[in-house]
């Protein structure tokens, strides 16, 4: 009987504590912007994102949906400059890639392929077409066609 607690302890310690998998889903990307109205206009008019209710109710923050429960949050309350490079970007996919490119061209919004060739569409090895553009604060955005 003395060994029963010891046996129980050995079994408990032998069982992995991490056995249950944590399931995550992507919720949002938040970016710091210098001019909230200018950025909102860009995301509404260029990327055609739908503005949704900012559930924090905090002034200087606006929320947009990209669909499927994924959001973009624009935050103008932080005044520190953000160092930006092309490797730090978010990507969107669209079935209307050609229409999107026409919209960029019509608004004279510059875009490029990954190496940076202006107004050039990159075609990946899997056939997906993509371009890169920057928002008013210099954040890089990748837009892909859908296979």
What residues fall within each predicted segment?
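Mid-chain, structured segments of secreted extracytoplasmic proteins
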Residues: 63-107
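Exposed loop/turn and edge beta-strand positions of beta-sandwich/beta-sheet ligand-binding modules
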Residues: 58, 86, 127-128
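Bacterial Sec-dependent N-terminal signal peptides
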Residues: 1-22
